[in-house]
Amino acid sequence: MAGRTSTYAPNQVTIVINHAASGISHTLTGFSEDSIVSVERLVDTFTEYVGADDTHTRVFNANSGARATVSLAQTSESNDVLTFLHEFDREAMSADGMFEMLIKDNSGRSLYFSDEAYIAVIPQGGFSNQMNTRDWVISMTNTTFQHGGNQKVSPATADTLTALGVNLDARWL
């Protein structure tokens, strides 16, 4: 149904890290003004192969890894948590340094989850006459991707999603 107004609330995006080895659970706070987080797959799901005789094959890539870039203001206390998680991982040099990571838009249906994530790139430091951003690059293995909308779905879309095996929460119908 056209004409439905959607609502996206940036302050409803949550990023939660659970680190089993230390027992901590931390919700990241203090995001930058212009960006919160971006998530991208490491590789295409399928790669096209074309033979010399123009036969086409798609090759499935099972790699479900992703990279998330989390943008925090330099004043965010979450910078401290991520710094010391990174140090824990460097010293552990084992799976004990990895953590679960959930990125969720609570004003919509998008979510991204990995049960094995780790800090791949720590941000550059810098200071100026303005607020600086710290961009943390986090590698996520076994990533679940769910790109979802932020408005109620039409009956036709609900039927389509049901046919695809999706069970929508009643608030979206």
UniProtKB/Swiss-Prot annotation:
Keyword Nucleus applies: no
Record Pfam families: KPP10_Orf10
Cell location: Virion
UniProt main location, coarse: virion
Keyword ATP-binding in annotation: no
GO CC terms, sorted: virion component
UniProt keyword annotations, A-Z: Virion
Official protein name in the record: Structural protein ORF10
Protein's organism: Pseudomonas phage KPP10
